[in-house]
Amino acid sequence: MADLSGVYDQTRRRISDFVGSLSEADQDRPVPAAPGWTVHDVVANLTGDLAAIQTDDFPGSFFAAVGEPDEVAKLNAWTARMVEERRDRPVRDVLTEWEQLTPAVMAMLRGEQPLPSGLPPFVDRVLVTDVAVHEQDIYGALGLVRERDCSALRIGTSTYVAGIWLRLGELAPPRFETDEETYQAGQGEPGATARTGRFELFRALSGRRSPEQIRAWEWSADPEPYLHLFYVYGPRTEALVEP
């Protein structure tokens, strides 16, 4: 199994080096994948995640009801607060805070220190998935194609698919066929098989593709019953096209 703390920190370093090298104008560039946010805000969110773990302020209830409107609203308010708290600080200061918070949280993920009681046991995968999502948000905002086959993205894809399994209810599991790997969200005969690229699958599972974009994949059956499963952070109506 991948060392998830190592994968997280490797991705953090990559983002920090990249964002730290940007001009102030590019650090303030809007991020289409995260409407209303800039590159600065994305870094603030990632930093706030670790601060919240250390202070036991992580919204554990969200993971018990993923995608439910009330929980999505709570999560969005929590995220907005952590971003707002860092909005007036220079990016370099936020990156420094992120770096300083990382060792203690990584020790928790490795089992060397106790995690706060409200966190789910798979919080390590949640953090790796989140950092992979936001790394691509940043690259997409700048029109760049980078790190689309990295460990964090692969782990994030399998984590999102596992999350669909937990939310299927009475639906037969969907199967996703990509050139790199096949994923199935549950056991038994699939109710529908979709074929697309792994990067597209990852971005869709993180809510970065519109329903129309997902419908346009090659489906073996009607995709409609499955579309809501792609939006754990709330619906997306506008298409997001990335290079």
What is each PLM-predicted segment?
Residues 16-38, 59, 107-119:
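Helix-loop segments that flank and shape redox-cofactor active sites
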Residues 1-4, 29, 58-68, 111-243:
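Structured surface interface patches that mediate subunit assembly and partner/cofactor docking
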Residues 1-3, 51-110:
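Short, helix-capping/interhelical loops that line the mouth of catalytic, cofactor-
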Residues 12, 46, 50, 102:
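Short amphipathic alpha-helical/adjacent loop interface patches that line ligand
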Residues 7, 17, 36-55:
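Active-site-proximal cofactor/substrate-binding loop regions of enzyme domains
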Residues 10, 34-45, 126-133, 196:
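Aromatic- and histidine-enriched alpha-helix N-cap/loop-to-helix transition segments
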Residues 1-20:
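Non-cleavable N-terminal signal-anchor transmembrane helices
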Residues 16, 43, 54, 95, ...:
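Non-transmembrane alpha-helical segments in soluble domains
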